[in-house]
C-alpha cells in the first residue's frame, strides 16, 4: 500500500490472469519466461483530503498535524468525501458528501472520520480481493507520506492483518531498481527492506462490525452504492 496525495493498494495476483470487477488488472512484470499480474485498488484522496479539510475547517496549516489529532481522537461519526469522487472499488464521481454523527470534539472528530474513510476504502478493496485470490499475503507493507500510525492501526483493525510501515521512504524507486536489475542480469536483486513499525489488530469485533455497517449505510446515503 502507498499513501501520498492519493492512495493505492496493490496485490500480486500471481501468474494467472485475474479480473475483479471494481479493481484494476494489469501486468506486474513480464519477460520471455514468465509473467505476473497485478490487482490494484486506487483511492482518490489521502493527503489531499486533509488539505481540503484543513481549508474547510479553517485550521492553520502549522496547527493541522492530522495524525496527532486522529491519534488522540475517537468518533462515532462518518465522513464520505465527495469532492474527489470515490475510486476503487465503486468508481463513482457525482455523490453527496456525508459528514454526520459527531460528538463535541470538533473539528478533530471530523478529521478522524476523514481518516477512517481512507481505511474503510482499503478494507472494501481488501474484502473484494480476498474473494478472488487463492493465495493471500500474510501481512501488508505501507509506505508514503500519508502512512501515519493512526491510519495504519485503523486499517489493521478493519482488515485483521498486521501492517508494516516501511523504513524506505520511496519504494517506487526500489521497484524500478529491481526491474532494471532483472532486465540486465536475468536475476532478481536480493534487497532487504526494513520496517520501522508494525500494527496488529486490537479493535473488538463488535466495534469493528458496527463501524463497517455505518460506513456502508453512509455509502448508500451518499449515492455510492
Task: Give residue ranges: language-model regions.
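Active-site core segments that coordinate phosphate-bearing ligands/cofactors
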Residues: 1-141, 147-225
Amino acid at each position: 500500500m502507498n499513501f501520498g496525495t492519493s492512495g493505492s493498494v496493490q496485490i500480486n495476483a500471481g501468474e494467472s490472469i485475474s479480473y475483479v470487477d471494481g479493481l484494476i488488472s494489469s501486468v506486474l512484470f513480464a519477460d520471455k519466461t514468465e509473467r505476473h499480474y497485478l490487482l490494484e485498488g486506487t483511492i482518490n484522496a489521502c493527503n489531499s483530503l486533509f488539505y481540503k479539510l484543513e481549508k474547510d475547517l479553517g485550521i492553520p496549516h502549522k496547527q493541522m498535524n492530522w495524525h496527532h489529532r486522529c491519534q488522540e481522537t475517537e468518533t462515532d461519526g462518518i465522513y464520505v468525501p465527495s469532492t474527489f469522487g470515490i475510486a476503487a472499488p465503486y468508481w463513482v464521481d457525482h455523490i453527496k458528501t456525508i459528514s454526520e454523527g459527531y460528538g463535541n470534539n470538533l473539528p478533530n472528530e471530523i478529521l478522524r472520520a476523514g481518516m477512517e474513510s481512507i481505511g474503510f476504502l482499503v478494507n472494501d478493496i481488501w474484502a473484494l480481493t480476498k474473494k478472488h485470490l487463492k493465495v493471500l499475503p500474510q501481512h501488508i507493507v505501507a509506505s508514503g507520506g500519508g502512512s501515519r500510525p493512526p491510519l495504519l492501526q485503523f486499517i489493521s483493525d478493519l482488515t485483521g492483518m498486521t501492517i508494516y510501515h516501511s523504513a524506505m521512504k520511496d519504494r517506487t524507486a526500489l521497484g524500478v531498481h529491481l526491474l532494471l536489475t532483472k532486465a540486465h542480469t536475468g536475476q532478481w536483486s536480493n534487497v532487504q527492506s526494513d520496517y520501522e513499525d508494525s500494527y496488529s489488530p486490537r479493535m473488538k469485533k463488535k466495534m469493528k462490525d458496527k463501524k463497517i455497517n455505518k460506513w456502508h449505510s453512509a455509502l448508500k446515503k451518499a449515492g455510492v452504492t
